[in-house]
């Protein structure tokens, strides 16, 4: 007999949503241990990955332009000319530091408690237009592309890491894949909710 899943609750209860995703993807404590193992040996990898993905974002004007916007959390000197924007620009260095913190957090987290689920949910929400003054408002296509690229870069780093044995590499790669599908879902959840809200607002007029 099929297990019942409450569709409406998936949209309102983060724990319930995560539990469903975890069961579907078979994301277990073993995967969390594999991610924690990567975190213990991957500080240089995380540092380089952060720079690599921002270099990728600066390769296209459509993604580069997002970093020319003023955001609530950046207090440094803004480079406002896209032609002058580089990895050494203050707003990019700030973002590189932020994503390093994010990667360290999601890889080191040993217990996926409600506070952590709120964290990865909020990371998604601020990229939409639903977080008020905290919103970055990035089109989802760029978020999705970045997750794909980020996962690829991390997996490539794991494959070529000399301090990780082959068995553990396989476990880490599988765990990373599950991790980013879950995180991507926690992003798309907010984008879909925003789309539903917009459609409901139109119907109400």
Spans of features found by a protein language model:
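Short terminal or interdomain "cap/linker" segment that borders an active site or interface and mediates
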Residues: 2-3, 9, 16, 160-205
